[in-house]
């Protein structure tokens, strides 16, 4: 085997779907679907990126500290950092060893959160003293970011269906010093008649395939199938159809 190693490792490039599936260790059905939507070159780059080790992103809690000041503190501890490309309050840490053990984390100066998640709240951009509804809210990264954008002024209703997830929202809000979030146990697939046309802004992080975080959880590739995608599509439609009814005329949903 060792003598024929190079020959054994060759992958037939004749079938482009098989080639990407084998080379980058992704299910064939997934590659096939992606190529139909995005084209071969994009999918090749996506698969390559999925196999890279992700960097840790944190969101600065600007209610307590500026990004510049926190950056200085982290650098003084030996952390290699840089600003996120698009999120205004994000920092990328290349060597996040024991990052949750430092005082700045315990004091609520930052929360671990992907840049893509930060951008959702940044786009919604709720005003102070607004009423915001955050559906499928746990663990509260977006809810606490929305509160931060609002200057901790107004009201945010954060809903999820599990008690332990609601507790995560409370814990994160408490550590960050945020007190405008009210957690509620509620199934987003059910319509709440009492909230129709009541909220100024609505954030919907509907249950999804998780394929966008393959770098962080590579096992997701093998825990999903085509049937899962169809079921999730139905769930998402029901939640979104309910959510749009809660927004006041002129309100915004992301």
Question: Language-model features: where?
Answer:
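S-adenosylmethionine
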Residues: 1-254
């Amino acid at each position: 085997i060792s003598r024929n190693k190079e020959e054994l490792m060759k992958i037939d490039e004749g079938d482009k779907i098989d080639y990407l599936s084998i080379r980058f260790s992704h299910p064939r059905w997934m590659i096939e679907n992606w190529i139909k939507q995005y084209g071969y070159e994009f999918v090749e780059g996506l698969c390559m990126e999925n196999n890279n080790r992700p960097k840790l992103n944190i969101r600065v809690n600007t209610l307590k500290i500026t990004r510049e000041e926190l950056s200085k503190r982290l650098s003084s501890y030996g952390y290699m950092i840089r600003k996120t490309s698009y999120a205004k309050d994000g920092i990328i840490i290349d060597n996040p060893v024991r990052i949750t053990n430092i005082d700045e984390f315990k004091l609520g100066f930052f929360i671990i959160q992907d840049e893509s998640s930060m951008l959702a709240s940044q786009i919604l951009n709720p005003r102070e003293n607004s009423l915001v509804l955050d559906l499928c809210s746990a663990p509260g990264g977006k809810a606490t970011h929305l509160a931060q954008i609002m200057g901790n002024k107004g009201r945010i209703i954060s809903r999820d269906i599990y008690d332990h997830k609601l507790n995560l929202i409370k814990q994160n809000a408490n550590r960050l010093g945020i007190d405008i979030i009210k957690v509620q146990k509620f199934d987003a697939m059910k319509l709440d008649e009492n909230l129709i046309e009541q909220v100024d802004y609505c954030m919907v992080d509907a249950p999804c395939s998780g394929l966008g975080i393959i770098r962080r959880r590579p096992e997701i590739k093998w825990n999903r199938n085509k049937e899962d995608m169809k079921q999730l599509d139905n769930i998402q439609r029901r939640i979104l159809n309910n959510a749009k009814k809660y927004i006041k005329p002129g309100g915004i949903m992301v």
